[in-house]
Amino acid sequence: MNSHELRFAFGNPVLYAQIRRVMQKRLTYLSRATLIDLCNAIQAVERQQVKGMILEAGCALGGSAIILALAKQSQRPFSLFDVFGQIPPPSPQDGPDVHERYREIQSGNATGINGDDYYGYVTHLEDIVIANMSRFGININTNAIQIVKGLYQDTMHIDQPVAFAHIDCDWYESVLTCLTQIVPHLSIGGCLVIDDYEAWSGCRKAVDEFFAMRRDSFRFVMKSNLHIVRVAK
């Protein structure tokens, strides 16, 4: 356990125990450090009383959504966007790494965490996510959680301020759609976490292109993943 994790564990023993439990139950692909960083970002938003909703784009089995739901104030709206099925194909804007990964998924040979079934092959995935949240004592109604199923370009229509967004959707077009829809509504002090900036070429390209002419309004911090905080409108 490094010093960063140790500080979090001592300061947030209940949340830390839940992070360990989420990982033990193989509900997330994220590292422990990444989940801790997500918690710290949510706690900063709550501490600073940043206005707006929380959202996650791409929730897989719901592991990170569980941690975000536990870290936020129960009354703050939280929307989970996902196709809740097999990921859509990449575009020509994505690099060879992305297309190779998609071929593996499409072939039926992708595997999940520690050899489990790959979540993209599972039917009724949204029901599994809701059930996983329930196992951690999270009721989606009393915790102001909304499940939004479908392609982001069809479903992501933001009409309120955003305090925090976890963007975990891999490919160029998906990431660019999320940024285009979310960033105009991101409050000052609000935070974006880009999960796949270093993992997939298309994600990195979408982020770099989108923020190329907007950098002065944001602070970019590379933690376990890329965190982007709005500092000005």
Label each PLM-derived region with a short phrase.
Residues 4-32, 47-233:
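S-adenosylmethionine/decaboxylated-SAM
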Residues 36-50:
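Conserved alpha-helix/loop element of class I SAM-dependent methyltransferases that forms part
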